[in-house]
Amino acid sequence: MSLVNISNVHKHFTRGNERIDVLQGVSLNVGQGEFLALMGPSGSGKTTLLNLMGGLDKPTGGTIEIAGSRLDTMGGGQLAKWRARHIGFVFQLYNLLPVLTAQRNVELPLLLTSLGGSERKKRAAIALKIVGLAERAKHYPRQLSGGQEQRVGIARAIVNDPTLLLCDEPTGDLDRKAGDEILDLLQALNRDHGKTIVMVTHDPHAAERASRTVHLDKGTLTEAAA
């Protein structure tokens, strides 16, 4: 069953009098429980497509349906509520707040919910345990390695039990060993916890961990050869 259904999506920006076509008729289906790698050169539109899937932007044309909801027809307020419930984001640069402990960083998405403090703490502790950092809950980002910081970032992304996990170059700022550990974790989230994952990467080594790979180049999408 498809969780993500993207049909004939176009996206363009304007710079002065110039029109820049970033996505040109992209269509893509992602199955429930799939781990998809999205590859392509710099400037190919990978992050733009990921942002559209996460409801951070809207297409110029075409349709985007995720978990039965049409994102392209939603207003800004609707999108924000939908995004908070259904999407977990993992970024290349972690984006942790340095003045908060690992646990408090993981709790941040839950501040937008009606959950009380004790329940937020409990869910953050569970997420940190899943990523193997239960013993680092009280540590600040400066006390963690880069790989550990990214694990906290992943815990923050899964703390609200999202429908879809979107990862933008999650190993791009890590050395090979730490990057492999993050890829191991993403595979485990997909395999053991049933998380549907779309991962943007330029690294073929990282893409090998996914169950399927697609390539985006000059705004058009092609399936990788089996």
Language-model regions, residue ranges each:
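Conserved switch/coupling elements of ABC/ABC-like ATPase nucleotide-binding domains
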Residues: K218-A226
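ABC family nucleotide-binding domain
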Residues: S2-D217
